[in-house]
């Protein structure tokens, strides 16, 4: 897309906003320019406004405290219009005029909250006041309190509709005017412009709001220098439904945080046009008193902002920040429609949530595909896409009753809190008797003869970390037995680093991933770069680049034929199909002795590529004295191929048919076979 096209799109959005939204958006953008750019823009603006006498006259009126104080004699509609047109022109340092503005603004806000009139105008006035350089920290704290109260009242069921004709507000805090407003005059646009359907500034502050107002501390109730304090509001008969609190009470921060997250008023649609937030990193939650699951440990929601940003849906972070992980996973288009999310956005969100539900089936397809020799680069790219999605630590309470009751003395302990919240307290229970699903894969059993442990159980539904770890084991096996690829190894190591810092993975899973990392790093050191041939000549075109930001749907990764045509490493034809070798059987080796599988003449030199049951796991994969050892054999002919060249260091000659197997290759084969021998008792098989 050309630059002029991008500018055109931005201009079309800009035209769809009202003047207040345009101002806030421009200020947000100006915060990102350099001082030179800012000065240049200032010169341009001063030059263009030099001959505008009208704006100079308007600015003079806006900074006259005497003129502003006389506005209280005007009608309510005119006062609101005057405030909107003059408040942006207030000069910083003019404390006298500012006090008059704040005093008048208090009355407008009090009237708007009680009578449900001028709601849109009140939003805009608050937005101007909160970002205005003339307001102080105390001013913004008090204004933020008004903002919270306005939002609280609206969330309780108010609607921005014209008031009934019989409504007439009378009270001690009524601000004067020669005539009451007619019903049709309740909310006209300012400067003779009709109100826009989505023309408002969101309640939550964006980055354009000074940081001081983003946290309402202990001085939240501090009055302004001009002694502005929220006045008690009298209950009006037109307020249906009414607010739960008493008419003269302000809601406490606890009450604000306890409100339901899904009672957003229908006048505040969460559309891109109505939001001035420009990135997921900006402040999207309500003022500090409300719930924010993005910051809760073990919530599984910490990665939601970055995930939404990758989908270009970061403007809806405020909606997700009020949800739990389970609520997010059950979102539907109907619910999003009730929150007034635009049609296109809610359809995209619903599709993205559906793909989150399909992650486990995608991972299972990936596991099968890697076993069948699929394109390793594509599998790594899919794993990269999955790891950036929101993933919650699996709780044992999510497992089936069979899994929960499987020989554990304390079935509720791991599920009482997120597994990684207090990892130190769980280490002992994991080492003694780990749950099969939660802590996959556990440490290997001490001896293969121990038949007291059950066979490796399938990963429980919803246990994304375990399923992800399982696929990572398959990929590690593939890396160990195939020609080394620097890009694949780098991508794999990046994935492991993300997993090691992710709260959803258990300590046992992280230890396993760390051992695989060490194994791959050892492999990288074993094969010097200069010993490898030109990798680009062997790597076929990687044409399956991720152009979209969403995950592939389930089933799209199981196309073995398409994958095998894009294989980036040479695979010799198999002497026996995988099914006959029993590599995909539940026991892992299908009844065929690993020793026989290694020494069988029928496999020949081609069978070596099919040893998918390697245990890439660190020290646990090394030969031990308690296990049967595999003797050296001469039944595997060695071919002088690029694969063979890469498998040996430069100082070790390539063996011929009559030589012993190189110790490096032998060590790898021993590691694979030792894992296969212990597969029945060690539930860490990567098959």
From Swiss-Prot:
Residues that bear Asymmetric dimethylarginine = 595
* Ranges of Basic and acidic residues composition bias in the record: 160-172, 424-435
Q: Where is the composition biased (Low complexity)?
A: 175-190, 200-211, 278-290, 448-461
Q: Gene Ontology terms, cellular component aspect?
A: cytoplasm; nucleus
**Which UniProt key words apply to this protein?**
Cytoplasm, Methylation, Nucleus, Phosphoprotein, Repressor, Transcription, Transcription regulation
Q: Name one GO biological process term.
A: regulation of mRNA stability
Carrying Phosphoserine, the residues are 172, 271, 278-279, 281, 548, 550, 556, 585, 593, 621
Where are the Phosphothreonine residues found in this chain?
400
**Ranges for domain SAM:** 299-372
The primary location reported for this protein is cytoplasm
Q: Which residues cross the membrane?
A: none
Cite the residue spans of the region called Disordered: 160-301, 402-464, 600-636
Q: Where in the cell is it found?
A: Cytoplasm; Nucleus
Instruction: Please name one Pfam family that this protein belongs to.
Output: SAM_1
Gene3D superfamilies named among the record's database cross-references: Smaug, PHAT domain, Transcription Factor, Ets-1
Bias (Polar residues) ranges: 215-224, 617-636
According to the lineage, what is the superkingdom?
Answer: Eukaryota
Question: What is an example of a GO molecular function annotated in this UniProt entry?
Answer: translation repressor activity
Q: Which family does it belong to?
A: Belongs to the SMAUG family.
**Protein role:** Has transcriptional repressor activity. Overexpression inhibits the transcriptional activities of AP-1, p53/TP53 and CDKN1A.
What PANTHER family does the entry give? PROTEIN SMAUG HOMOLOG 2, STERILE ALPHA MOTIF DOMAIN CONTAINING PROTEIN 4-RELATED
This protein is called: Protein Smaug homolog 2
**Organism source for this protein?**
Mus musculus
Q: What is the lineage of its organism?
A: Eukaryota, Metazoa, Chordata, Craniata, Vertebrata
Name the encoding gene, please. Samd4b
């Amino acid at each position: 897309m050309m630059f002029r096209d991008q500018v055109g799109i931005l201009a079309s959005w800009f035209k769809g906003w009202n003047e207040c939204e345009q101002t806030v958006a421009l200020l947000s953008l100006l915060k990102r320019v350099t001082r030179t750019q800012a000065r240049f823009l200032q010169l341009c603006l001063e030059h263009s406004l030099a001959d505008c006498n009208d704006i100079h006259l308007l600015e003079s009126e806006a900074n006259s405290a005497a003129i502003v104080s006389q506005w209280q004699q005007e009608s309510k509609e005119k006062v609101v219009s005057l405030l909107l047109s003059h408040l942006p022109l207030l000069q910083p340092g003019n404390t006298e005029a500012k006090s008059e503005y704040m005093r008048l603004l208090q009355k407008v806000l009090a009237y708007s909250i009680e009578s449900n009139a001028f709601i849109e105008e009140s939003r805009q006035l608050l937005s101007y006041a909160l970002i205005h350089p003339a307001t102080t920290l105390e001013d913004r704290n008090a204004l933020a309190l008004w903002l919270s109260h306005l939002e609280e009242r609206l969330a309780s069921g108010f609607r921005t509709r014209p008031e009934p004709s019989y409504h007439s507000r009378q009270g001690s805090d009524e601000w004067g005017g020669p005539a009451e407003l007619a019903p049709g005059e309740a909310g006209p646009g300012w400067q003779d412009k009709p109100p826009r359907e989505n023309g408002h500034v969101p309640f939550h502050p964006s980055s354009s709001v000074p940081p001081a107002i983003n946290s309402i501390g202990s001085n939240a109730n501090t009055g302004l220098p001009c002694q502005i304090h929220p006045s008690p509001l009298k209950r009006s008969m037109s307020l249906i439904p009414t607010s739960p609190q008493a008419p003269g009470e302000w809601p406490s921060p606890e009450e604000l945080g306890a409100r339901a997250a899904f009672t957003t008023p229908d006048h505040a649609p969460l559309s891109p046009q109505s939001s001035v937030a420009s990135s997921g990193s900006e402040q999207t939650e309500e003022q500090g008193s409300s719930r924010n699951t993005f910051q809760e440990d073990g919530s599984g929601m910490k990665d939601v902002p970055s995930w939404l940003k990758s989908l270009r849906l970061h403007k809806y972070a405020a909606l997700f920040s009020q949800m739990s992980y389970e609520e997010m996973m059950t979102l539907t288009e109907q619910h999003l429609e009730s929150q007034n999310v635009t049609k296109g956005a809610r359809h995209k969100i619903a599709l993205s949530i559906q793909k989150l539900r399909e992650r486990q089936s995608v991972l299972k397809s990936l596991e099968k595909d890697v076993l069948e020799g699929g394109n390793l680069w594509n599998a790594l790219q899919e794993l990269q896409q999955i790891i950036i999605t929101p993933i919650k630590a699996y709780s044992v309470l999510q497992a089936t009753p069979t899994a929960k009751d499987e020989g554990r003395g304390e079935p509720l302990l791991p599920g009482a809190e997120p597994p990684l919240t207090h990892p130190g307290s769980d280490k002992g229970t994991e080492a003694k008797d780990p749950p099969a699903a939660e802590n996959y894969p556990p440490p290997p059993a001490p001896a293969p003869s121990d038949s007291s442990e059950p066979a490796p159980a399938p990963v429980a539904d919803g246990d994304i970390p375990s399923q992800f770890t399982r696929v990572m084991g398959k990929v590690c096996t593939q890396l160990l037995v195939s020609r080394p690829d620097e890009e694949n190894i780098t991508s794999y190591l990046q994935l492991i680093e993300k997993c090691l810092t992710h709260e959803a993975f258990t300590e046992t899973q992280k230890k396993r991933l760390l051992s695989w990392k060490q194994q791959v790093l050892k492999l990288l050191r074993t094969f010097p770069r200069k010993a490898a041939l030109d990798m680009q000549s062997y790597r076929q075109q990687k044409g399956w680049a991720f152009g979209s930001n969403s995950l592939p749907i389930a089933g799209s990764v199981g196309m073995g034929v398409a994958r095998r045509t894009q294989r980036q490493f040479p695979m010799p034809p198999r002497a026996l199909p995988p099914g006959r070798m029993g590599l995909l059987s539940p026991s892992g080796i299908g009844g065929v002795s690993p020793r026989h599988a290694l020494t069988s003449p029928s496999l020949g030199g081609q069978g070596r590529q099919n040893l998918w049951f390697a245990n890439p796991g660190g020290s646990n994969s090394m030969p031990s004295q308690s296990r049967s050892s595999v003797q050296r054999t001469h039944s595997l002919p060695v071919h002088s191929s690029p694969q063979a060249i890469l498998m040996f260091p430069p100082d070790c000659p390539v063996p011929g048919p009559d030589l012993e197997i190189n110790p490096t290759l032998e060590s790898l084969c021993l590691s694979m076979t030792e894992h296969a021998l212990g597969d029945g008792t060690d539930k860490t098989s990567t098959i």
